[in-house]
């Protein structure tokens, strides 16, 4: 009898792809705190998962019923939609019932990936997110903040930065509650901020001088290349700053409110908490 119960519980396992990333880590922590079994889908996971090696996919789907689906490095890169399609087909053939996709606002390729889920026959939920607040503290922008000068090709366009904790809360709700099936949530924060204003709020929270310098996309791409960053990363960042940040996403949405029944976390609250945790200390 115990074996039957254990097997039933194993079949409720949720696969968290990108489980060591900004949102995946938080999703995994929340599911674990609820006593729900998870499997981390990453190159260091057991079994390992690698988007570039389809042979690793099937073992991670064994005895899984739901998947939190993130694509690395981004759904905008060439080949992402084909990979998502192949994975979703395998997931459905493996008996997966629920798929929750992390997507991006204003990205045509991401919307094509969303359509794959919508056509899959699974209980799907799509989280179409604005820029993460945590990009300033858990990404390559942390070092510029610590150095006191943030250089980016972003002008006077407002962005409704969303907190990764809000994204994780919505993702967990979608993975564990039936009412989110078939929902597309656009997730934003409660305010529009330019990147210069966001850096200013971080400066205020830390009590330090942190300057913001705007450069051209060409200058920025050249600087990234000189820093020996991968060409794919340079292309992606330039794409996001020149295409996604062209004003198309400079508006607020009510996705967090609809999904969770509460307001999203403000960028200033994120900045204060992150500063207090010492993340930006030199």
Residue ranges and their predicted role:
Residues 281:
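Short arginine-rich
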Residues 211-277:
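Mobile cap/lid helix-loop segments that border enzyme active or cofactor-binding sites
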Residues 2-39, 43, 49-55, 62-65, ...:
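Oxidoreductase cofactor-interface core, primarily capturing Rossmann-like NAD(P)-dependent enzymes
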Residues 68-70:
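Periplasmic-binding protein-like
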């Amino acid at each position: 009898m115990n074996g039957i119960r254990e097997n039933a519980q194993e079949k409720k396992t949720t696969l968290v792809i990108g489980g060591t990333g900004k949102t995946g880590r938080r999703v995994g922590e929340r599911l674990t705190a609820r006593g729900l079994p998870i499997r981390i889908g990453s190159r260091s996971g057991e079994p390992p998962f690698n988007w570039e090696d389809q042979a690793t996919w099937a073992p991670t789907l064994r005895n899984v019923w739901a998947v939190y689906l993130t694509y690395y490095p981004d759904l905008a890169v060439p080949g992402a939609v084909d990979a998502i399609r192949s994975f979703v087909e395998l997931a459905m053939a493996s008996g997966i019932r629920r798929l929750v996709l992390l997507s991006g606002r204003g990205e045509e390729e991401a919307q094509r990936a969303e359509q794959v889920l919508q056509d899959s026959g699974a209980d799907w939920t799509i989280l179409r997110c604005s820029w993460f607040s945590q990009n300033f503290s858990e990404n390559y922008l942390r070092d510029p903040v610590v150095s006191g000068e943030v250089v980016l090709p972003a002008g006077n366009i407002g962005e409704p930065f969303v907190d990764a904790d809000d994204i994780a809360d919505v993702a967990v709700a979608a993975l564990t509650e039936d009412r989110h099936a078939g929902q597309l949530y656009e997730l934003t924060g409660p305010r529009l901020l330019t990147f210069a204003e966001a850096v200013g709020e971080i400066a205020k929270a830390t009590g330090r001088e942190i300057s913001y310098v705007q450069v051209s996309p060409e200058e920025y791409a050249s600087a990234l290349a000189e820093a020996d960053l991968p060409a794919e990363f340079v292309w992606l960042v330039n794409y996001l700053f020149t295409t996604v940040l062209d004003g198309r996403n400079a508006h607020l949405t009510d996705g967090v409110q609809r999904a969770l029944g509460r307001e999203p976390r403000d960028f200033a609250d994120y900045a204060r908490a992150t500063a207090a945790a010492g993340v930006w200390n030199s």
